[in-house]
Amino acid sequence: MSEAEPSVVVAEQCRRSACDRCRGQKLRCERPVSNSSTTPCRRCLKAHVRCVTTAQPHRTKPLSSLQYLHHTESNYDPHSATVAGQLPVAAVAGLGDLDPSLLHMTGVQNPRRLSHSSSMANPVDSRPPGRTRRLSNPDHFLPHPPLHPNGVLDTDGTPLLDSIDHLPDMTASRGFGFSAALTPHSPSGSSDFFDYFRPMAEDNNRSPWMDAFTNLPPDHREGTPAGSNYRGSLTGENQFRSSLQSSRGLNGFETPQRESRHREMDIVSIKNECIARMGKLNRGLLQDVGLVNSGKVAGTLLFSQASRSTYLEVEKGRKGGQNYVIGKMLHSSKELLDILKQLERCKSTLFPPGHTERTTSTADEVTTAMTETTTLNQTGSHAPSSPLGGNPLPPLSGPLSASASHSSSCASSSSASASTSGASLLSSSTSAPSTSPAISLQLDTTLTLLFLTGYTSVIQLYEGVFSFIRDSVAANPSGSNFLPTLPKLQVDGFEVGSSTRDLQICILLQVSTHILNQIEERLHAIRDRAEGHVPAALLDTILDRSDPSQRGAKGRELCRIVRDIKEHLKHYAE
């Protein structure tokens, strides 16, 4: 019997391993008695931690399913499980009444659930690598993958599925799902902080702030769950339609007050963007007006930047037709028109306090379509509102204007039919009021003054350019061309060269009339919506609305110049 004892000691020494704490930290386990597995090591004694040693099996080959089940049940130690269960309780004991959802996101086990989950957990897993653990009672746990990022790792680096607590359902969340993880457990039921992290769909050719007011219909109405925005496919891919509506309130339902607040913030951002664009545009317009009024623009210098050293620095970096005075004039007019269209899309910006919009989204779409169709088909005399503060400019006559007038009449008839059908649809759709809250935000005085400065500068620029063209046409025969460097134009694939002087001037007058008509249409619309406020009084100083036949000084002068130019052209002289 005495000879068998050394063999037993040798067998135990071969099977002995480091304690659980040293093995988890990958440190050398130092024991006072080398052949004793019950004596605590020096590191555990210094840390005042109970030293637990669990024998590890020889991992020569993977165990079968039946062998693995028997092996797991035979190695279950209730005392070790109780000791390991005390560690997470001590870790979270100082957290107080922390939100349970934060414990879910960080992976820490909820101490309120340890009473039943710690007894089921095996802190030291002895399964072979590459095999998932089988749960004896799967009803207490969620069927998540074994390598979930929220799982707590064992001492050997393998995840413990028992430590994964309840995870929030992200399938019905919007955006990145931050608010869905905290809102159900929030004491106040609010997720205002996470509302600012929702993604926004940006388009390259349009401002991102405009998407909430243009073509995107509202995803939900009041009382509709946010989960209806989710659409699944048979292939397992999740398709989310991008939406810029306000974030949902408590339990995923829409809150009208929050939606109104976010829309007001977006409107203020749009106005700030328009102010910045108008400031940049007015600086360029004032430089162009100063150059034209200085008398230095003569002959070809109207269309070329040669011999204009002071103007070269301003024009440095520009390409194409914008290097010419006429090119810059048309470009500035188009920029002013784009800014006015941007404000027109956001109709709530132009409402003074006390005004409410009674139409639904269908009526808004019909109105927008009618406006765009009418704008694209209107030229010259068919403009509904007066250009330059009065009646439309005189229509073109002659061979060129005959076809233009015919096409304009066709466009006018089609516009009339479209407006008739649109009016019937509009009357049927305006019967029900909109459920979205009306936003009253008046157009401020700063933006109105910027619009007036830009509009008067554009009129002065057109007046200076057309005055030079009028004087040159009257002083030169109809066959000669005083515009040798006029940029070539493309009209339906036909290139208009420098030899066709009259045709170039006709096209320039027609394009200018069309742009100015649209600019003044939108200024009149802004003035109508600002009735009784300071912006309306400021616009009345430029837009003469008392008598349409009486234009302002600038408008009357520009119309007279255009008539003189047309009288001297060859097609109109005949």
Curated annotation (Swiss-Prot):
Record InterPro entries: Zn2-C6_fun-type_DNA-bd_sf (IPR036864), Zn2Cys6_DnaBD (IPR001138)
Protein name according to UniProt: C6 finger transcription factor poxB
An annotated GO cellular component: nucleus
Region of interest: Disordered: 111-133, 242-262, 376-404
Alphabetic keyword roster: DNA-binding, Metal-binding, Nucleus, Transcription, Transcription regulation, Zinc
Zinc found in the keyword field: yes
GO MF: DNA binding; DNA-binding transcription factor activity, RNA polymerase II-specific; zinc ion binding
Keyword Nucleus on entry: yes
Stated role: Transcription factor that positively regulates the expression of the gene cluster that mediates the biosynthesis of oxaleimides, cytotoxic compounds containing an unusual disubstituted succinimide moiety.
Residue ranges: DNA binding: 19-51
UniProt subcellular location: Nucleus
